[in-house]
Amino acid sequence: MGKPTGFMEYERQNKPAESPKERIKHFREFHTPLSKEEQERQGARCMACGVPFCQAGQMIMGMASGCPLHNLVPEWNDLIFHGNWEEAYYRLKKTNNFPEFTSRVCPALCEAACTCGLNGNAVSSKANEYSIIENAYEKGYAAARPVKVRTGKKVAVVGSGPSGLAVADMLNRRGHSVTVFEREDKVGGLLRYGIPNMKLEKQYIDRKVNIMEEEGITFVTNCNIGKDKKAASILKEFDRVVLCCGASHPRDIKAPGRDAKGIYFAVDFLKSTTKALWANDMKLVDGTYISAKGKHVIVIGGGDTGNDCIGTSMRHGAKSVLQVEMMPKAPDVRADNNPWPEWPKVCKTDYGQEEAAAVFGHDPRVYQTTVKEFIKDKEGNLCKVTLVKLEPKKDEKTGRMMMSEIPGTEYTVQADLVLIAAGFLGSEEYVTKAFGVEVNARTNVATPAGEYHTNVERVFTAGDMHRGQSLVVWAIREGREAAQEIDVSLMGYTNMNVQ
């Protein structure tokens, strides 16, 4: 702890954000990094706690508290305060393969568990992480380090999202020969097509993938395992196979009129925008994407993906945006039964919601509401949506609280475009069937508790395909742990340290 009184001397300083009305004019990241001197002062705010909850990564009441990767947050905060940015990078990389991703898209579980935030503002650890990794690229610390000795073992990774990339990176460093198969045209999975450009500019994915290629990893795109290439041939060619295909099967909304033209899954909407931008020099060309321009948009789902749909719709030039959320509004401050260091279950306004409020003059969200019916015109196009209010009721059989319709509360709103962001149900069935792996009741690939090997010999799994829809940081952790288990199965021992 370089400055014992740092948390008292310095206030938290956030990276300045471009104003909502200005940033919706482009698809670039919109936060301006602090200067190195300012960021060093932010590092001084870290209290170097005897028990640093920020790196605990524990589940409390079903929610994560602290970093699942067990990032050495107090260490690299102290190092940047002392100006030792290179060593800070090495301490960061010890636990996190991809800080260039997490420092942009992670909800900062570390900050929610920060002791400094118990009675004040948390240490800006996410921004510190961003500065460490970007400085490392600028100074050359993050350059490729090719492996010098190979084991002769070959591993296939199916899927190039964060878990697949983490598995590949760890096993390649160990000396195994790794090939990553991706069904899309570019590497990245969720990072590439599930997260909009203004949250994660795609050149940062390419920057890291290029380094991984220099280090010896082979990437094969436009190859859909289970369709374009048979599972049997993969198993014959490789010593081990890791399934990291994500939880890509979207949850649908079953309501009358669902077949109306103008209803899309959120991931298809976001993906079409990203592809159109990169095909046309970061400009949207009419007819090349699912457009919200001039339309009344309804987003179904109150999570991060729903917010991304709002932000993307605002950049398209939507006429109006309404976000429909089934659950009640969370409290503005922690409830007594939600104490620190639990994840704070409070109402938060994210960037897309902030942008819609700035343009339209009101919060786009409506709570305790769901779709009753999609209404079509004579041509089959969506023109309106009937919504209905909900209330929590206790199920007498299970004891669980369920959201039930309130009779007589139906109302109709205009809608030209509906985006379904209601989460994901699990992995793609054709992949699991191709390899013959068992799935659980949630259609996630089944493994013994705390392990990553499936019921099929030599086949492993990790990430959302294994644990269900989750955060990038959890996917990276699963990839690291799976790599360690795979290494043991190949070599009989491991020298990997994944925590």
Please give the residue ranges for each predicted region.
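Glycine-rich dinucleotide-binding loop and its adjacent helix/turn
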Residues: S131-V149, R207-D228, P250-H316, V439-N455
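A conserved FAD-binding loop/helix module that cradles the flavin
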Residues: G306-C309, H316, A462-Y493
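Feature captures the FAD/FMN-dependent oxidoreductase FAD-binding
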Residues: E87, V149, K154-V158, D206-P256, ...
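Beta1-alpha1 glycine-rich phosphate/pyrophosphate-binding loop at the start
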Residues: T5-T32, R41-A44, G57, P68-H82, ...
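FAD-site-proximal beta/loop scaffold in flavoenzymes
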Residues: K261-G294, K393-Q469
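Ferredoxin-type iron-sulfur electron-transfer modules in oxidoreductases and energy-metabolism complexes
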Residues: K25-E38, A64-S65, L69-R104, A108, ...
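C-terminal catalytic lobe of FAD-dependent flavoproteins
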Residues: R12-L34, Q42-R45, Y367-T369, I375, ...
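Short cysteine clusters
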Residues: C46-C49, C54-Q58, M63, C67, ...
